[in-house]
C-alpha cells in the first residue's frame, strides 16, 4: 500500500521548500522559494519520528547544510535518510546517524555519464540495504524521462526505463524519484510517470519506490495507490501545512499511513 513519506529540504542551512526547476549552482542565482521555516531541522525530525512516518529523507540542496543535516539526524538517530553530496569518502560517516544514504550526482561524471563502478563501490562500503539511488528526472519532448543531476539542471545519459531498474536493483533496494518539472509547483503529480514506475518495477517485490513532485491533495495518496497498485510511496512538500502550505494537512497524511497499517 502507498504510504506518505516526509521530507526535510535544506538550503543554506535552513529548512525550505523550493521550486525544483529553479535551483542552479550559480551563486548569483536565487531559487524560487515557496517557504522558509522558522523551525530548525530537528523540529521536523522529531515530528516525523513522533508520528512514526518511516523512510523520510533529509536533502542537502547545495553547500552550508551539513550542520543542519546532522542536527536532524541526531534528533532521530537511524530514522531518517540523508542525501546531497554523498560519495564513497563520506557515506559511512553519515550512516552513523542516518538509516540510509541517498546518492545522486556522484554516480555521474561532470558531463553526465553514468558510472556503474561508483555505485558498486558504494554498495561494497554500505550494503545495498543502506543505499537509496536518486533517479530524479526531467521529461524530454519525445516523452522519455531522463535522470537529471546538479540540482536537476543537467540531463545525464541515464534513462528511466525497465532496463535501468533491472540493472540497478542489484545494488540497492530503494529508489527516490523527484519529478523535477513539477517539483514544488503544487500543480499535481506526474500521473504517467507514477504509472510507469509501477510498470517498470512490478516484478520486484523487495524494491521500494518513492515518488516526489507536485502532490497537492491528501487524495493524491489514493491516486498514487491506484496508479501504482500500492507499489509507489508519495512525498509531500510545499503543499503541506507544516511547510506553510494550505492544501494538505500533515495530520491527514499521518492518518492515511495509520490506516494502511
Curated annotation (Swiss-Prot):
One of its GO terms (molecular function) is 1-(5-phosphoribosyl)-5-[(5-phosphoribosylamino)methylideneamino]imidazole-4-carboxamide isomerase activity. Its main location: cytoplasm. It is found in: Cytoplasm. InterPro entries: Aldolase_TIM, His6-like_euk, His_biosynth, Isoase_HisA-like, RibuloseP-bd_barrel. Gene3D superfamilies: Aldolase class I. GO terms for cellular component: cytoplasm; nucleus. CDD domains: HisA_HisF. It catalyses: 1-(5-phospho-beta-D-ribosyl)-5-[(5-phospho-beta-D-ribosylamino)methylideneamino]imidazole-4-carboxamide = 5-[(5-phospho-1-deoxy-D-ribulos-1-ylimino)methylamino]-1-(5-phospho-beta-D-ribosyl)imidazole-4-carboxamide. Pfam families: His_biosynth (PF00977). One of its GO terms (biological process) is L-histidine biosynthetic process. It is an enzyme of class 5 (isomerase). Its EC number is 5.3.1.16. Pathway: Amino-acid biosynthesis; L-histidine biosynthesis; L-histidine from 5-phospho-alpha-D-ribose 1-diphosphate: step 4/9. Keywords: Amino-acid biosynthesis, Cytoplasm, Histidine biosynthesis, Isomerase. Catalyzes the isomerization of the aminoaldose moiety of ProFAR to the aminoketose of PRFAR. Present with 6490 molecules/cell in log phase SD medium. PANTHER family: 1-(5-PHOSPHORIBOSYL)-5-[(5-PHOSPHORIBOSYLAMINO)METHYLIDENEAMINO] IMIDAZOLE-4-CARBOXAMIDE ISOMERASE. Belongs to the HisA/HisF family. This is 1-(5-phosphoribosyl)-5-[(5-phosphoribosylamino)methylideneamino] imidazole-4-carboxamide isomerase. It comes from Saccharomyces cerevisiae (strain ATCC 204508 / S288c).
Amino acid at each position: 500500500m502507498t504510504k506518505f513519506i516526509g521530507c526535510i529540504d535544506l538550503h543554506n542551512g535552513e529548512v525550505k521548500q523550493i521550486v525544483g526547476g529553479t535551483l542552479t549552482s550559480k551563486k548569483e542565482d536565487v531559487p524560487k522559494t515557496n517557504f522558509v521555516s522558522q523551525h530548525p531541522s530537528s523540529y521536523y525530525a522529531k515530528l516525523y519520528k513522533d508520528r512514526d512516518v518511516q523512510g523520510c529523507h533529509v536533502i542537502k540542496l547545495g553547500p552550508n547544510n551539513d550542520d543542519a543535516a546532522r542536527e536532524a539526524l541526531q534528533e532521530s538517530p537511524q530514522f531518517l535518510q540523508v542525501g546531497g553530496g554523498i560519495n564513497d569518502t563520506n557515506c559511512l560517516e553519515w550512516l552513523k546517524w542516518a538509516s540510509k544514504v541517498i546518492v545522486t550526482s556522484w554516480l555521474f561524471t561532470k558531463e553526465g555519464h553514468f558510472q556503474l563502478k561508483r555505485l558498486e563501490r558504494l554498495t561494497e562500503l554500505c550494503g545495498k540495504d543502506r543505499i537509496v539511488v536518486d533517479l530524479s528526472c526531467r521529461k524530454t519532448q519525445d516523452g522519455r524521462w531522463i535522470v537529471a543531476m546538479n540540482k536537476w539542471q543537467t540531463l545525464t545519459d541515464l534513462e528511466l526505463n525497465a532496463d535501468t531498474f533491472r540493472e540497478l536493483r542489484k545494488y540497492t533496494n530503494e529508489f527516490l524519484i523527484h519529478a523535477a518539472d513539477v517539483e514544488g509547483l503544487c500543480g499535481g503529480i506526474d500521473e504517467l510517470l507514477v504509472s510507469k514506475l509501477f510498470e517498470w518495477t512490478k516484478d520486484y517485490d523487495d524494491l521500494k519506490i518513492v515518488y516526489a513532485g507536485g502532490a497537492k491533495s491528501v487524495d493524491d495518496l489514493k491516486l498514487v495507490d491506484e496508479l501504482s497498485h500500492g507499489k509507489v510511496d508519495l512525498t509531500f512538500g510545499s503543499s503541506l501545512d507544516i511547510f506553510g502550505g494550505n492544501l494538505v494537512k500533515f495530520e491527514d497524511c499521518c492518518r492515511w499511513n495509520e490506516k494502511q497499517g
